[in-house]
Amino acid sequence: MSIPFGLDFGNNSSVLAVARNRGIDIVVNEVSNRSTPSLVGFGQKNRFLGEAGKNKQTSNIKNTVDNLKRIVGLDHAHSDFEEEAKFFSSKLVKMEDGKIGAQVRFAGEQQVFSATQIAAMFMNRAKTIVQDETKGKVTDVALAVPAWYNEAQRYAAADAARIAGLNPVRVVNDVTAAAVSYGVFKTDLPEGEEKPRRVAFVDIGHSSYTCSIGSFKKGELKILGTAYDKHFGGRNFDRAITEHFAEEFKGKYKIDIRENAKAYNRVMTAAEKLKKVLSANTAAPFNIESVMNDVDVSSQLTREELEELVAPLLKRVTEPVTKALAQAKLTPEDIDFVEIIGGTTRIPCLKNAISAAFNKPLSTTLNQDEAIAKGAAFICAIHSPTLKVRPFKFEDIHEYSVSYHWDQQVEDEDHLEVFPAGSSYPSTKLITLHRTGDFTMTAKYTNPEVLPAGMPEEIAKWEITGVKVPEGETSVPVKLKLRCDPSGFHIIENAYTVEDIKVKEQIPPAADAPEDAEPEYKEVTKTVKKDTLQIVAHTFALEEAVLNELIEKENELAAQDKLVAETEDRKNTLEEYVYTLRGKLDEEYAAFASDEEKTKLKDMLAKAEEWLYDEGYDSTKAKYIAKYEELASLGNVIRGRYMAKEEEKRQALRAKQEAAQMAEMAEKLAAQRAAEQKAQESKAESDKDAEGDIDLD
């Protein structure tokens, strides 16, 4: 069975967690880091995923795609696109479906991949990291995404997981996942009729800021309000610092880092480190060697100067707090605790502003970097048939009202508000319509004027067929089960026609009726299910044929990555064998090879080395294996002789040690027997003297 996996899909880095019988663990990656860079790099033969991509980002800047969370499911025509493009060094393009893709040079040619594809590449790497660490099968995942993701973005994230070979059992809001982590592991939550504990969660990460208000009782969580600022995060601080130094270096060193993508990236990376240093210190130096044109730059920044640079951002700190409280219909005084998560909340001026907004001290009982992933792993475990977890129920909140629209046939109305703003989900509503034939239904946001710019009004559309009107009737009642599922997707779960039939129903006997009285019946009308209708959904999810094609493509790329890695490993093994064997041939192995063998093998090693740095520099896995086996055919014979002699020496040494131990033991036993004999003789002599004594008393 699959190990429950929670993925905190972060913009700068992602955190991976798994649920096991002993609890929830964070999974470390191949370099033992507890988070993995969320990016994908493209090279001449293979991709560089996560840590590998980060290591090559500066040298491969135009072919490395980061900020994945920001472009998944986003339309190229969306008003956010221009803002997002500022943070990309790779070229963003418009795909055929209107979504965003990235153009990179890969495998020697220009190629375009959709944002969903690239996110899937990263998620596949995350899956591999978990499988390598746990040595288990991983398919089920709870995917933590921003609360500001619309339906299209949530579907795109789920599709990315599917392309990566994962089954997204739930797409959950990231701050809600952190709240679940809080609720599951807190042992002092109120119970029964006690007043619920109200906790505000403030998450400021790399690219966005979310505030959610949760109401807790033991085993229960209800999100009361959520608000956010999509363009307020650590990267905005980094960019402000970078722009400050760009202007300074332009005047001081006569260089413009804005004209050089690599230089700009290096300064922004250094700016991120400087920001972290200034969270603990009031001032810090800023130095980069050969940033561009062989120019070394040097400067410094104080915490006070940083706060001046980000003053426009700081003015927006309280807005999400105010909106979340308003949606929850609460005041700051109603909040019991304020939990902060996300790396950017470590900045002192932000902590002070958040504390002032709630007029209370901040709590850090949650791990700021790992709470979301742990909550997601627990949520995935809830869906596991094999892992038993403590009962915990949680509900999220509809930010916008959703109505369902239908073809007007019999009814006066052609739509109904089904899921009001502020209502909880998952939620199900059953409605009845009178239909004259097949029809379509559409889910739309009720008040499009309140939606963020660029957000589509339409959510989904369904074609409902198989409607049969009884002879002599003008319409037939159709029942529809409308649902907002646990992932926040709006669906029609089922649809069927109903009919009224007359049945006989027994009348309960009177209290004074005799026991042997004949039962009496009455005729009643009952509504029963008649025909199940067919539903064809048109959502933002990828069509099955397209999804399968992308899955196949990802599997091919993953196989190519694996082949390249194995080929490089074989090449390194061959190279190491050449150098190691050459060194040992004149030393340890010298006595175990004839002069003829030495000459022959040295010649083979020289030719292999020459081949490695010439035509074999970029060869195939099979050729590296063949070259290795050719050398090993003689080298391993000599090594075998050496190992046999070494084993003989070890056996001789072991025999000598055992003989010495036996001799030592025999000597000890002999000494022990001699001591015992002497003691017996001494005792006998003593007893003899005692027999000759005369008692004068």
Curated annotation (Swiss-Prot):
Residue stretches of biased makeup (Basic and acidic residues): 675-691
Compositionally skewed regions (Low complexity) per UniProt: 664-674
UniProt keyword annotation of Nucleotide-binding present: yes
Keywords for this protein: ATP-binding, Chaperone, Cytoplasm, Nucleotide-binding, Stress response
Major localization listed first in the record, in broad terms: cytoplasm
Annotated region (Disordered), positions in chain: 664-697
Places the protein is found: Cytoplasm
Pfam family name, one: HSP70
GO molecular function: adenyl-nucleotide exchange factor activity; ATP binding; ATP-dependent protein folding chaperone; peptide binding
Alphabetical list of InterPro entries matching this protein: ATPase_NBD (IPR043129), HSP70_C_sf (IPR029048), HSP70_peptide-bd_sf (IPR029047), Hsp_70_fam (IPR013126)
Gene Ontology annotations of biological process type: autophagy; proteasomal ubiquitin-independent protein catabolic process; proteasome-mediated ubiquitin-dependent protein catabolic process; protein folding; protein refolding
GO CC annotations on file: cytosol; nucleus
PANTHER family: HSC70CB, ISOFORM G, HSC70CB, ISOFORM G-RELATED
Similarity remark: Belongs to the heat shock protein 70 family.
Protein name: Heat shock protein homolog SSE1
Organism listed in the record: Eremothecium gossypii (strain ATCC 10895 / CBS 109.51 / FGSC 9923 / NRRL Y-1056) (Yeast)
Encoding gene (name): SSE1
